[in-house]
Amino acid sequence: MVLPPKDHPRYKSLLAREKLVSASNVVAKQGLIAHGRGEAFDYLLGEQTCFPALSAIKAASSAIAAAKNPVISVNGNVVALAAREVARLSEVSGAKVEVNLFHRTPERVSGLTTMMKKVGIKALGEDADDLIPGLSSERAKCCSDGIGSADVVLVPLEDGDRCEALVNMGKKVITIDLNPLSRTAQTAHITIVDELTRCLPLLSEFIKDGKGLSDFDNKKCLSDVLKYIAERISS
């Protein structure tokens, strides 16, 4: 991996790109396109965690803390960018971690579980024995003791139809998505419109400290994010 100079004004963004490229054996090429789209929205947010996102993070903290079987669903982008942050969240919340992929191959699942093992997490995913109803082919696969039986699922950087399928299964779905207009953002119960590596440490901190928010309206939160973006652009 080629490290960008630390004095570069966009060091964190460049580092994220390098991490994705370096993990090209487990990150789908389509994931690079999705990351670039997210970066564009982060520009609009000023590359900072806005107040509506903080409210969503607190709501997510409450939901995960109250869950009986919380699961963090991770894909190639999530592991490449934030394996340590996911491990920390799993540690403080007790949530299981499951590798769940849109472009699923045994090699990618194995590679990603190995990457999570290096940060101390035994991730589920290799022995998928259950299916998510409403999805076709390989991407429907999941683990019965993970996503299959979860009551709350955190699905960062997820695609819209799988998010909708999890909601239809009766699960409480939390997502992290920089695009407040995406199907995923609009479908989830709690949408954190923030950059992955910026909000995961906050989520872990809020769970550890017992900071939460029980009264939360996702549609209003997304509307507030759009207002925040509009005000930034017009100011």
Summary of predicted features, one role per range:
Residues M1-A95, G212-S235:
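Electropositive, gly/pro-rich neighborhoods at or near active sites that engage anionic ligands
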Residues A66, G148-S149:
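Alpha-helix C-terminal capping/helix-to-coil transition sites in glycosyltransferase folds
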Residues V74-R84, H103-E107, E158-D161:
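Gly/Ser/Thr-rich loops at beta-strand to alpha-helix junctions
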Residues L89-A140:
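Long, charge-dense
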Residues F102-R104, L178-L181, L196-R198:
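Short, acidic/turn-prone active-site loops that include or flank metal/cofactor-
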Residues D130-G148, L154-D161:
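Active-site glycine-rich loop that binds ribose-phosphate moieties when present
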Residues G160-L181:
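A short, gly/pro- and small-residue-rich
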Residues R183-S235:
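C-terminal functional extensions of proteins
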